[in-house]
Swiss-Prot record:
Region G1, residue ranges: 311-318
Name of this chain's protein: GTPase LSG1-1
Keywords: Cytoplasm, GTP-binding, Hydrolase, Nucleotide-binding
Transmembrane segments: none
Amino acid sequence: MGKNEKTSLGRALVKHHNHMIQETKEKGKSYKDQHKKVLESVTEVSDIDAIIEQAEEAERLFAIHHDSATPVPINMDTGSSSSGITAKEWKEQRMREEALHASSLQVPRRPHWTPKMNVEKLDANEKQAFLTWRRKLASLEENEKLVLTPFEKNLDIWRQLWRVLERSDLIVMVVDARDPLFYRCPDLEAYAQEIDEHKKTMLLVNKADLLPSYVREKWAEYFSRNNILFVFWSAKAATATLEGKPLKEQWRAPDTTQKTDNPAVKVYGRDDLLDRLKLEALEIVKMRKSRGVSATSTESHCEQVVVGFVGYPNVGKSSTINALVGQKRTGVTSTPGKTKHFQTLIISEDLMLCDCPGLVFPSFSSSRYEMVASGVLPIDRMTEHLEAIKVVAELVPRHAIEDVYNISLPKPKSYEPQSRPPLASELLRTYCLSRGYVASSGLPDETRAARQILKDYIEGKLPHFAMPPEITRDDENETADDTLGAETREGSQTEKKGEEAPSLGLDQVLDDLSSFDLANGLVSSKTKQHKKSHRKQ
């Protein structure tokens, strides 16, 4: 009897032990499956993907006839309108609407949380807050006068940003020096102040070696007037100096023609930037302690100051981190979104760097192709290469394209404005002809040429830059002329002379008109045959 009771007790213990092991395996498997999915940036989703994602985030099934199942109509043609207004009037209306709804473009906020909150509750609150934020942006997309650029739609990516902002004393927003305001997110600075009023945000103006010194002076004046903390920096130049290798790219050579004594225009080196970051972060910590504010739970366990790096993809965050660390610690590539998780890197006993994945913040823009040309969206996923090349052709001077690629672009016709930029088709076909890019169909491989031109544009091989908003278009053209040199000025004078009404003969005018008709398919086949026979006679 006792033996049987002992046996049954042992079996019960073994059964309970096996049951606990099975539960542990199932929990581990579910955790592994949950984190097995690679963290990937998502900027565009289809209608069905959006419906499924909303259903998962809301943790309930959507009815078939739910309102959100109806695709939101988005008018991507910003130059047209059903009311028949001109393109200029449409642009003015769009700018007024953007100014009216500028405050609606916010970074998603992390809901309030406490260390005592369990994982399920925290996850549900974050999903609900993110879903509410997505719905607010969807309501903006319903406005036909607004064009919302693609933005990050993966909650896990935004979670990385939340962690970095909470851990960091100083937030460094890395921007491209050629157009700093395009990459700057003012609401991110406001969000950092909401988390902790003592946090500061610094603009790290990367790729500053691509700007002439007078352009850096203009931007330095603009940043100072608007109380923006900034530093000019070049990750590529710092890496080359660290490795003891000269810059191979001649277009990235330091600007020695125009020197200035303004210290604000100086392009910082590695040691100077580390000292500046440490100084700014220590001031924040001292100010926080002097006012009796306790440190957050993440930073109270150590005396290190934390500097977090945030910004758009492909602006040079990972390159900057590698240059500051002194060795390759984060992946660097021309494709946006290489960094998947935030990383903490210890520089010294009192300084820690925190790298955040690149985020595409929501913004208003006239075209998504500007984001492709800027490198924010991947070039390899580009579908309309002509529109993206059009952006490059309009921003880079004609002579600069010809000098860089050693090509000769077709000149404008006599009936066209002589100062017009080259067409995208002209640039692509000329480039394909000079490089021998031919597709399998026998036609010029314009897609391959477009990808190469866009990569050169992003890398800085094709020179371009934007001026501060206070600079008028005429002033920008005048300052740009100063950097082009004597050859450029001679070329521009030739173009200005060409703008005057030339004395054309009747035969030349007829030839131009016939070529225009042929290009637009306005000439019938009979006319072509008659013209050929007339020439033979």
